[in-house]
């Protein structure tokens, strides 16, 4: 009898519409778009340009040492120096040699800083550029040695020097040998200064730890890119130590400018022109 027949039901997947919607979404290659960490806008990579600056809020994306070199130095003027120096893994830190090898292969760099000489609008200078894609540009024995040799070379050749900083601090895998580079580089900076030579530091995002507490803060003129994170200890560590809530803009370049730790904040698009002008003024003073 039809009255007692078992009813039949068709099961519908409640997530079907979501699954179909996801399936309909086109795959967009990551290299085509970037999301701005500041304003959260999705930006077409070509709109960022070679300076990698957000067109919506002027946020400065982090860039590699090679990208930095391309927008600052005159074309084909950079002569790299002090390559081939390698860490001996003084603490026998497990996995450290393998990590170094993998990072070198991925970045095409031999360490976290590029050192050499270049011209900027025709003005010759010694130049060092740190690269945060290389183990967060942490300062180990090789970084310290390359920077020290560059300062010594600049002192001998009577050259000004420009250093672009970007670092997470000392390299923990090298322990006290890493911390020693703070004193070593600072001494080299002092000898360069005693010779009456010109030193510019450009603080970029992020510049922290032992790098901030040594050569990064010793420039005759200290410039910074907008909104760069600059400090020694981390925000959370400081708040837990002093038991106070820090201002929202604490450790930002603008905060440091207002408190006298930075001489000027320069937009990335204007940095090449500003550096060339400073080098030119320094040269003119020398010739007086």
UniProtKB/Swiss-Prot annotation:
Residues 32-288 form the CoA carboxyltransferase N-terminal domain. Belongs to the AccD/PCCB family. Coiled coil: none annotated. The gene is accD. GO terms for biological process: fatty acid biosynthetic process; malonyl-CoA biosynthetic process. GO terms for cellular component: acetyl-CoA carboxylase complex. This is Acetyl-coenzyme A carboxylase carboxyl transferase subunit beta. Binds 1 zinc ion per subunit. Its EC number is 2.1.3.15. It catalyses: N(6)-carboxybiotinyl-L-lysyl-[protein] + acetyl-CoA = N(6)-biotinyl-L-lysyl-[protein] + malonyl-CoA. Pathway: Lipid metabolism; malonyl-CoA biosynthesis; malonyl-CoA from acetyl-CoA: step 1/1. NCBIfam families: accD. It comes from Lactococcus lactis subsp. cremoris (strain MG1363).
